[in-house]
Regions:
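Solvent-exposed interaction patches of small proteins and small membrane subunits
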Residues: 1-90
Length: 90
């Protein structure tokens, strides 16, 4: 799995999301208006969705490609379909 992802990119994205979540927590403590908190929650959600997109793209470009070329194509496609289904629920 490591070879199909840009680990540094993913770690940096996750650190940013972590910072966003901590900022949301501080906003709640500071009694910031609800609308502003919702905006930040949406930003964190969007960032997580993008991380999922990056992971799914890496999975397709490496794991799925390798599974089709060197493994069981039917199982690989079925597993990828499940991954896409999970991603679509984000």
């Amino acid at each position: 799995m490591r070879q199909c992802m840009d680990m540094d990119n993913l770690h940096n994205r996750l650190k940013r999301v972590d910072g966003q979540i901590k900022a949301i927590d501080r906003m709640i403590e500071q009694d910031v208006p609800c609308e502003d908190i919702i905006i930040q929650i949406n930003a964190a959600k969007t960032a997580l969705h993008k991380i999922g997109h990056v992971v799914l793209e890496g999975h397709l470009n490496h794991c799925v490609k390798d599974g089709i070329e060197h493994g069981d194509a039917e199982k690989t496609i079925a597993d990828f379909a499940k991954a896409v289904e999970y991603f679509s629920r984000l």
